């Protein structure tokens, strides 16, 4: 973290992302190392960029993690000094309210935002099936073959994504969240 501070001239906050396996100890380590923000990711996150055993069986649900991370921050007298942002399975307003009530400073969404933008759109069903999945079940965004054109660098696939429509859909999702 010190090296990052030197590179950035101490002008930007340093975020450290930790998984939900050992929230108390990993939060403590991040704070003692000098993090400005701890991003705690629970096991229900939609990552597809790892082996199935990690996706399904490693970590704890985000709500179980928050209490331990907050306790670590309180034990260090850093609660509300070092921000705690939580993610991983946050899908609706009730999830956000629970996270905030447990002591998080903010929440973030990932997969929910992709779906709101139009990923997993049924109109690309045939192409999802070619990838061995179906619309609504696609989660291999890291492969860069997203038929909806959202999580890809393929110029032809990217043409499918309408940023105006995607923005409208995401805006609607966030309003009702």
Which residue stretches match the model-derived regions?
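Glycine-rich phosphate/ribose-binding loops and adjacent secondary-structure elements
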Residues: 2-158
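C-terminal extensions of enzymes
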Residues: 158-177
